[in-house]
């Protein structure tokens, strides 16, 4: 076959759209490393997939199922018929210790585990290292630490100074408006 056309493949599928879907799926399989059923003949994977469909070396139904399976968001699980719930049992009663919150609802084990604080074990070497780091490395003069009473200003004094400044601004604004 020198050249593959849609007419060569259209009798193998129901519509040209399905042909595109099936050929694309086979090209993806070839890109992922599957070996082609025909000789490559220096062709690209899309051409090889069309040649395989035209020559019936690959089943179209398998490619359709593969494409549909990949596009599904929820893959159906095969149930073997055994009921696992009865074998495992209900562990809620064994885990629940009977604690009840203030609102009257039971406290589940996962909630209790979050409320219990984790105890941290610290060695004595770590404590010594932390206390050594907590001490300041810079010497501070005692005179600078204790403020003079003359320079100490309370918040009330600052608030009074701000209100005085505002009233003087308002008075100066009033005098400017009357002068003009």
Swiss-Prot record:
Keywords: DNA-directed RNA polymerase, Nucleotidyltransferase, Transcription, Transferase
GO molecular function terms listed in the Swiss-Prot or TrEMBL record: DNA binding; DNA-directed RNA polymerase activity
EC number in record: 2.7.7.6
A GO CC annotation given for this chain: DNA-directed RNA polymerase complex
Single biological process term from Gene Ontology: DNA-templated transcription
High-level lineage: Bacteria, Pseudomonadati, Pseudomonadota, Alphaproteobacteria, Candidatus Pelagibacterales
Gene3D superfamilies: 3.90.940.10
Protein name: DNA-directed RNA polymerase subunit omega
Key word Transcription present: yes
Family designation: Belongs to the RNA polymerase subunit omega family.
Subunit-level organization: The RNAP catalytic core consists of 2 alpha, 1 beta, 1 beta' and 1 omega subunit. When a sigma factor is associated with the core the holoenzyme is formed, which can initiate transcription.
InterPro entries associated with the record: DNA-dir_RNA_pol_omega, Pol_omega/Rpo6/RPB6, RPB6/omega-like_sf
Residue spans of biased composition, Acidic residues class: 137-151, 159-180
Disordered: annotated span: 100-180
SUPFAM superfamilies from the UniProt entry: RPB6/omega subunit-like
Function statement: Promotes RNA polymerase assembly. Latches the N- and C-terminal regions of the beta' subunit thereby facilitating its interaction with the beta and alpha subunits.
Organism name: Pelagibacter ubique (strain HTCC1062)
Domain of life: Bacteria
Catalytic activity: RNA(n) + a ribonucleoside 5'-triphosphate = RNA(n+1) + diphosphate
């Amino acid at each position: 076959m020198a050249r593959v056309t849609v007419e060569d493949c259209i009798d193998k599928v129901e519509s040209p759209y399905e042909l595109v879907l099936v050929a694309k799926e086979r090209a993806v399989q070839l890109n992922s490393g599957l070996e082609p059923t025909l000789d490559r003949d220096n062709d690209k994977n899309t051409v090889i997939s069309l040649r395989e469909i035209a020559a019936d070396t690959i089943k179209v139904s398998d490619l359709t199922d593969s494409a549909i399976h990949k596009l599904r968001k929820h893959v159906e699980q095969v149930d073997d018929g055994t009921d696992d719930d009865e074998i495992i049992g209900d562990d809620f009663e064994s885990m629940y210790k009977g604690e009840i919150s203030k609102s009257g609802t039971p406290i589940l084990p996962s909630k209790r585990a979050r409320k219990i604080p984790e105890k941290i074990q610290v060695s004595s070497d770590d404590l010594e290292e932390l206390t050594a780091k907590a001490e300041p490395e810079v010497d501070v003069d005692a005179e600078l630490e204790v403020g003079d009473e003359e320079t100490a200003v309370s918040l009330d004094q600052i608030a009074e100074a701000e209100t005085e400044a505002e009233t003087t601004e308002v008075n100066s604004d009033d005098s400017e408006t009357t002068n003009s």
